[in-house]
Amino acid sequence: MTDLTRRYAKACDLADFRDRRLLGVLRDILPERDPVTHVERKVWEFAQLAMSFEDLGLLDHRSRVLGVGAGDERILFWLTNRVGEVAATDIYGSGDFASREAGGSMLTEPSAHAPFAYREDRLEVRWMDARRLEFPDASFDAVYSLSSLEHFGGPGQVDLAAREIARVLRPGGVALLCADVLLRRHPLNAAPVDLAARAVSLGTKRRTAGLRRRSVVAEALTPRELLRHVIEPSGLELMQPLDLSVSPETWDNVCRLYPDGRQEPATGSFFPHLLVQVDRSVLTSVCLPLRRGT
């Protein structure tokens, strides 16, 4: 397995979308969109996955790859045309994403979800909880998960998923994990504050709050939580130092997300869509390239 040729352990940044290789990969994965104008952090995650797997020699039509919380994202169909096998796992048909990218029909008719022709013989789709992966130890050459870890529950549940991802990786295997990271967490968006609000309201508000679990900004991880609940429990090695800095221009179009789902970009234009404000805090995507020791 070869080494990484570029910076992957980083936060999503507007400058990334000026990189010719990244733009070329996005044109291949999403040919119907212009990546120069459709600047979005979710497709950045696709590019990070595709480029890192290419760097590491995994796009060899032999590698066995597991997608955790895979939904029906087009990257899994793209991978079937380039690796030996893709196992897509999710709680299909249940959970918060059942009506979106994790519909139950993915289990019975994945071809209906495919945006382009793919190697159907290389795709296996299974209902599976990320905290209890039903595969033997050391089953996969690579595992990926894109913006899913933070949705698995409280910190203890993320720990379990991280351990399971490491368990099913073969020695020397790679996990490419993307998650929502809080670049700025307001002091009021803290677990003790949410827990106090829950207590004062006699449990009628912020019902999911706990000693270590936020309620208002629950589905994003702080840098410390990435370390404590993803990297350390997995026992995997971060392949590069993590860079969470973003350029000033990336902050120009922070999109405010309201509880009812409304989105309000600072400039009035949806793109670039890289930073999201939830309540008083701001998040984006982060990429973690991890390797299991030999």
Model-derived regions, located:
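Class I SAM-dependent methyltransferase Rossmann-like catalytic core
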Residues: 2-59
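Class I SAM-dependent methyltransferase SAM/SAH-binding core
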Residues: 66, 73-132
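A short acidic, Gly/Pro-enriched loop at the edge of an enzyme's catalytic core
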Residues: 128-143
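A short SAM/SAH-binding and catalytic strip from SAM-dependent methyltransferases
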Residues: 141-156
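A short glycine-rich, Lys/Arg-flanked "PGG" loop and its adjoining helix->strand segment in the class I
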Residues: 159-171
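Conserved beta-strand signature within the Rossmann-like core of class I S-adenosyl-L-methionine
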Residues: 172-180
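Short alpha-helix
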Residues: 213-241
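A C-terminal cap/extension of S-adenosyl-L-methionine-dependent methyltransferases
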Residues: 239-294
